[in-house]
Amino acid sequence: MLSPNDKMLGKLDPFYQPSVSKQKTSAEIISEARNALRTVRTQRPFTPQEAQRKLFGPASSRTSENRPPSSFSLHASSFESSDSRPISGTRLSPLELKPKVPASPTREEDSCFSFPKPPVDPAKIRRVSNARARLFRAASQRALLPDRSLPPSDSKKTVESKETVMMGDSMVKINGIYLTKSNAICHLKSHPLQLTDDGGFSEIKEQEMFKGTTSLPSHLKNGGDQGKRHARASSCPSSSDLSRLQTKAVPKADLQEEDAEIEVDEVFWNTRIVPILRELEKEENIETVCAACTQLHHALEEGNMLGNKFKGRSILLKTLCKLVDVGSDSLSLKLAKIILALKVSRKNLLNVCKLIFKISRNEKNDSLIQNDSILESLLEVLRSEDLQTNMEAFLYCMGSIKFISGNLGFLNEMISKGAVEILINLIKQINENIKKCGTFLPNSGHLLVQVTATLRNLVDSSLVRSKFLNISALPQLCTAMEQYKGDKDVCTNIARIFSKLTSYRDCCTALASYSRCYALFLNLINKYQKKQDLVVRVVFILGNLTAKNNQAREQFSKEKGSIQTLLSLFQTFHQLDLHSQKPVGQRGEQHRAQRPPSEAEDVLIKLTRVLANIAIHPGVGPVLAANPGIVGLLLTTLEYKSLDDCEELVINATATINNLSYYQVKNSIIQDKKLYIAELLLKLLVSNNMDGILEAVRVFGNLSQDHDVCDFIVQNNVHRFMMALLDAQHQDICFSACGVLLNLTVDKDKRVILKEGGGIKKLVDCLRDLGPTDWQLACLVCKTLWNFSENITNASSCFGNEDTNTLLLLLSSFLDEELALDGSFDPDLKNYHKLHWETEFKPVAQQLLNRIQRHHTFLEPLPIPSF
């Protein structure tokens, strides 16, 4: 007796059917428990928080010799005061200059030739004005300095431009001054020392100065005497600029602007920066030095002196790095922030990242890191520096970010500063490099461990999950997992990310649509079959994908070797679980239900869930039902496991058997072993676990369509148990129990059992108490009573006088639409109830009411007269 809804699905075998798939609503959530084929839920694998902050935790597959250290010593001597780029080892050939500019003036004073003046860029004028304004601000806060040259002691600290020395028909450029050879030698004798690019002083030797010179074209011969000009850096083109003179003349406005900015920087340096550096050199109490560092950072920022173009950078670095040895975490963070702002590179970048990493290992320093906005500086390193050149620096930078990402106090800052986008971009760079070059970057696997661990901490946020979908992060993670499938740590972290993401419908749908993920997950299961921490998460992900998407069930099952992979995994962990089982006499009886599942049990729980979910697909379910290996392991699980041993595993295995028993196919192992399965279910029926009882009754609902199983039910008094369950006042249990009784009443010989156990009254009570809120259950009750009353001659003799009158009253009122649907439901639930009332309950109830009315007399019997 199927409802119109059931008939539309075109499947007449089971006694109840799943509802038509549609967008999930609150009404559909209620009806899910009624489906003959049901998905199975489970908990996400637990990931304990690491006790210590390290690059690689205790569960890492890396050996101590095969990974970068988390502990190291770091001192001022670790840093380099010179942070210039390495000099190329290739000697370039001199360029033959053929300038197209007019011949040079004959006067030596005009060797810095004058070119036609193009219109001055207004933006450049503004920059010069700003530089001048900065000078006036600095001067107003300190004693006003002379407008021209600095005192001799200070001028020695001024960084000059590169030296250009030419021999014969050449010229010499020293500290921005072009000199002839003879004048240059005199200049060197009177100025033997100069400040080098790295901030140190060096002595210029004549032979070094004139080494490797080249001759100049005629227009540069007889160069003018620059002694009349002030020594200002870059006031004339350097040797590296000469090659550009063929096509481009240097505008005089640019030279004037550069002169002004350099002059302003010198004044600002001496009036604002030098006094702070002197304060730092005193190394008084930590609070004073920290305050001075903060003041220094603000001053450098105000003077626009941050970055790798700043000329006093080496002197500044030397002063700052010296303070690292003080050993104060708060001071070191302030030093690190300034050093990073100076755009250091190579060894210094690595060491400053190590310094922050070392501090961030202590959770107590999280507040210091947050107060100093160190996160922003670290993200800037990842955003702006070159990945290949600075892989090790990136590693420790990411290690620090990973540590603080575990602190919820940083979550909003990380999201707002673009951490998610930056980290996914890093993964993308690594993926693209492998695709382009076919090789792995050194230490890229170590870096990916830190990146993926950080993302794992962040994906609990709905904002982060939304960003993942917007920037297509899931395919990038799958690609990284595929390329680094030999790195268990990377794969485990990405599996943890997917475990969290697929617990949400939108993310689960996005991953399910990436068709390559199924083969990837199967490969990981085959590769790491005995690595429980990875396998359990991969299987959990597959369970999520197949629970919410029928297309995912189909795609997974079509992957080569998918069922065999699941079977092999089932066998592996079944054996591990058997070996870990204690003898019955040694098992503790107290608090057994509270014992968490073992590692092997946890994998089996997730695995049976996948089997139950994919069995819903009509193309997969019959295949699984006919697989002796799958069915055999499920039955073995019920044989040696009790609800007290592992409740979730037993219930999942039973739910899987229920879904497989739905398919009435010739080669079904379930059908061949139906009586043995019925025996195994008896121990669940007599348990005190309501979930276990419910799953067992559901299986009996499918199996009881077979005549032999019905005989087994009656012989073992299972029908009495089903009638007793009608008193449970639990809608799902009553629904399933009523389904078994309905199947029993198909056999005319077994209809009488309803009267023997008071079944009719229990069915009527169930209709009265639960019918108005569950029209599907009310429909099943009416179907059962319809089957029972097939050969009715008199309603009262069939149902009993009291139950007949109750049925007439209930059916009449339940068939009144206004009375039946006058419930306080939200619109969604109201439509749901109306649908099932109209399509399922009303047709059957109307026929039953008509039958009772036809065979019932309303004449009351006359009382027996008394004599």
UniProtKB/Swiss-Prot annotation:
Skewed-composition ranges (Low complexity): 70-81, 234-243
Keywords: Differentiation, Disease variant, Repeat, Spermatogenesis
ARM repeats (start-end): 262-301, 304-344, 363-403, 408-449, 462-503, 506-547, 551-589, 591-616, 619-662, 664-705, 707-746, 748-790
Residue segments, region Disordered: 1-115, 214-252
The organism's place on the tree of life at top rank: Eukaryota
Polar residues bias locations: 18-28, 40-50, 60-69
GO biological process: cell morphogenesis; cilium organization; nucleus organization; sperm axoneme assembly
Effect of residue 760 to N: In SPGF38; uncertain significance
Tissue expression remark: Expressed at higher level in testis.
Disorder: Spermatogenic failure 38: An autosomal recessive infertility disorder characterized by asthenoteratozoospermia. Spermatozoa exhibit multiple morphologic abnormalities including short, absent, coiled, bent, or irregular-caliber flagella.
Stated role: Required for sperm flagellum axoneme organization and function. Involved in axonemal central pair complex assembly and/or stability.
Protein name: Armadillo repeat-containing protein 2
Species this protein is from: Homo sapiens (Human)
Lineage: Eukaryota, Metazoa, Chordata, Craniata, Vertebrata
Designated gene of the protein: ARMC2
